[in-house]
């Protein structure tokens, strides 16, 4: 049984039916689909790889690859380029509905319900005294009920972000994603990522521990920090991002946690869809291959697939509390397409901190300071 039908839950259902077509898979969610979900909507190359592995790459149909990416530091240092592989931007209202349809087409049964009680007994997990399964996968998001019922602690504010997202007309010209670190609430960032269909997802996010205002204050900061955007007020939604710099146990007993419910959100970028798809797939694999001890199997699979990358991302996320490191990183990326790709991958996929990146940071800081000296802002470097 899978609780939550977002990317993590749908991936778990798809993988379970792929591995064992005759398996009985219940996909439980309180919402009707399609439904909106506050998110940055970005799918990096590794998320696309996951969709292909699940046989669900068709969910991207109608949304072209977005090749351009521009990064900006708090002092205005910019670097722009085309990463080695493009990204996609698909609104969650579309993506999630298509993934649920794919899971149903594969044979999963969708139930509109919620989980209020969990009991593990006699080799089964009983949900609300009615539904029973050998393994339950909790994929019910940042405010996971399954996680709370298991007694797994929530992320502390130092490892929890709050963000606001809206939809605005996309800027004219070649589609280009903008990720800009900003001093307001540092470490914080704004983004504008076009879907390729005339619309851009725009937003602002920062650590929960650095924000003491209300929703109106979030909206004000977004408009102030991204003045060129004009989001539809009705599209503005706030949401939490539980960063992977806090590592809770990924379940208890026969109940596994995946995606945001397992705090699998990159602390550098807020990216979560790739980690949701990957962890959902791995949770299903663990449930089917080792149903008597799925948690141990799941831990091993997660550690092998994501462990080192997430540790490196957490180290960098702590380090960029010093703004000079962000400047140094962008300065290094401006001088090397390879380092540009490494920086992007640290935020979106599988990269690790490399000796080459560390060696380039002093030169990068000098380049960034030279670019912004005297004016407080600097020209964009282009890597390729």
Task: Give the location of each predicted region.
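Predominantly flavin-linked oxidoreductase catalytic cores and closely associated redox partners
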Residues: 102-233
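Glycine-rich FAD pyrophosphate-binding loop
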Residues: 5, 14-39
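A conserved beta-strand/loop capping segment in the N-terminal third of enzymes
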Residues: 21, 48-100
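Short, well-ordered alpha-helices that flank and scaffold nucleotide-derived cofactor binding pockets
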Residues: 14, 18, 49, 101, ...
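C-terminal helical "tail/cap" subdomain of flavin- and related membrane-associated enzymes
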Residues: 285-384
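FAD/FMN-dependent oxidoreductases across multiple families
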Residues: 117, 210-287, 292
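Generic enzyme active-site microenvironment
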Residues: 27, 138, 258
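N-terminal Rossmann-fold NAD(P) dinucleotide-binding loop
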Residues: 9-10
